[in-house]
Every structure is written in structure tokens, then in C-alpha cells.
């Protein structure tokens, strides 16, 4: 198979496939006499794994580890499960951080009258300025 065939079958662009090759994330393809890359089913499997792992949040380094596990006949499913659960925990931490940010933004929005006044508690809060609050207290 050539690179365009692999791109169609994996849903990756030719550029992405070359990038993964340059990063050493997939087994290097053989070269035909004319210098074109020749891919096998193994390459399809590795590239599909990379695409799907990226879609669920694994970074490039983690994807490389998953490809190595894929190619290791002595791998243990416990290793794959451990990495997957670590990724879940990381995503849960990120979700928690995002929810906290959302709560802070909503609290700021609720404190703002949203009228034609130049005074804005949101700007005051974000800038650390208490000018707005000091005027209200007087």
C-alpha cells in the first residue's frame, strides 16, 4: 500500500502519517525501488491505534508507549489498563479544574450588572482592583 491508501484507510492525512514516522511512533515503512514508502497491515494497525489514542486524549509520548505495547508480544493487559486509568484520572482532574473555572466565571458574571456603566466588577476582580468595591462602601 502507498501512503494515500493508508491515509484513506486510517482517516489520517499523509502529512500526519509522515509526522508520526518522523517522530518514530510507527514502524518505518519499507521503500520501493522508486523510493516510495510501502505499508503493510501492521502499519495500518499502528496508525489506527495512534489516531484513536489521540482522539481519546493520549499525548504523543503516551501514544508511542501504546504502540510499543501493541508491538510487544510479551505485553500484559495490566500495563495497558494502568495507562488507560492514569489517563482517565488526568482527564478527571482537568474536568475538575474546568468546572472550578466555570464556577468562578459564573460568580463574576452574577456580580456584574451588565449595564451601560463603566464600573465592572468582573474587570475589578480580574485586575485585583478593589476600586469598585471601595466606592460602593463609601
UniProtKB/Swiss-Prot annotation:
GO terms for molecular function: copper ion binding; DNA binding; DNA-binding transcription factor activity. Its main location: cytoplasm. GO terms for biological process: positive regulation of DNA-templated transcription. Residues 4-23 bind DNA. GO terms for cellular component: cytoplasm. The keyword GTP-binding does not apply. It is found in: Cytoplasm. Keywords: Activator, Copper, Cytoplasm, DNA-binding, Metal-binding, Transcription, Transcription regulation. InterPro entries: CueR, DNA-bd_dom_put_sf, MerR-type_HTH_dom, MerR_fam. Residues 1-69 form the HTH merR-type domain. Regulates the transcription of the copA and cueO genes. It detects cytoplasmic copper stress and activates transcription in response to increasing copper concentrations. Homodimer. This is HTH-type transcriptional regulator CueR. The gene is cueR.
Amino acid at each position: 500500500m502507498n501512503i494515500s491508501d493508508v491515509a484513506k484507510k486510517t482517516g489520517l492525512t499523509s502529512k500526519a502519517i509522515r509526522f508520526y514516522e518522523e517522530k518514530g511512533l510507527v514502524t518505518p515503512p519499507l521503500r520501493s525501488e522508486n523510493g516510495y514508502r510501502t505499508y503493510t497491515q501492521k502499519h495500518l494497525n499502528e496508525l489506527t491505534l495512534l489516531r484513536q489514542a489521540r482522539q481519546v486524549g493520549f499525548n504523543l509520548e503516551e501514544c508511542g508507549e501504546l504502540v510499543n505495547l501493541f508491538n510487544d508480544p510479551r505485553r500484559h493487559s495490566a500495563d495497558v489498563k494502568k495507562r488507560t486509568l492514569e489517563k482517565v484520572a488526568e482527564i478527571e482532574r482537568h474536568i475538575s479544574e474546568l468546572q472550578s473555572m466555570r464556577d468562578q466565571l459564573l460568580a463574576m458574571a452574577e456580580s456584574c450588572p451588565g449595564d451601560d456603566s463603566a464600573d465592572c466588577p468582573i474587570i475589578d476582580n480580574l485586575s485585583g482592583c478593589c476600586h469598585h468595591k471601595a466606592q460602593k462602601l463609601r
